[in-house]
């Protein structure tokens, strides 16, 4: 089904709340199907990684949908561990929003999650973090 690098959206099975966006190649998709746990292709490290392998934030796959071009998949998941998905400590990687105002360009981000679920330094230590906070 997946023969190239595809975008992968993760959302909570019961609420459809979007958790994160990642990428999968054919091998990551195969591993995800076999284990029923999300695996991704790291574009920066050039390797497959299993979500939660270090953090315990495992994503148990419950349902998979694929778009008409077969270049994007949506996984409905149940969260393991601390019930979070974002490596900076929030439940979702989509913890900020851009407010739309008529006729204006706004480049300010507004936080939608007020508190972190966990302290990322307790889990990841001083590992490099590419996220722009």
Name what the model sees in each region.
Residues 13, 18-19, 24-133:
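C-terminal binding/interaction regions
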Residues 1-7, 11-12:
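Single conserved hydrophobic/aromatic residue that forms the stacking wall/gate
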């Amino acid at each position: 089904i997946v023969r190239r690098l595809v975008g992968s959206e993760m959302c909570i099975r019961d609420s459809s709340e979007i958790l994160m966006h990642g990428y999968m190649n054919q091998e990551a998709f195969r591993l995800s199907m076999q284990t029923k746990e999300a695996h991704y292709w790291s574009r920066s490290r050039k390797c497959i990684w299993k979500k939660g392998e270090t953090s315990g934030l495992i994503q148990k796959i419950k349902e998979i949908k694929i778009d008409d071009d077969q270049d994007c998949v949506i996984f409905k998941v149940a969260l393991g561990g601390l019930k979070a998905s974002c490596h900076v400590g929030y439940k979702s990687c989509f913890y900020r929003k851009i407010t739309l105002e008529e006729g204006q360009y706004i480049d300010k981000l507004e936080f939608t999650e007020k508190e972190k679920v966990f302290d990322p330094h307790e889990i990841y230590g001083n590992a490099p973090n590419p996220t722009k906070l």
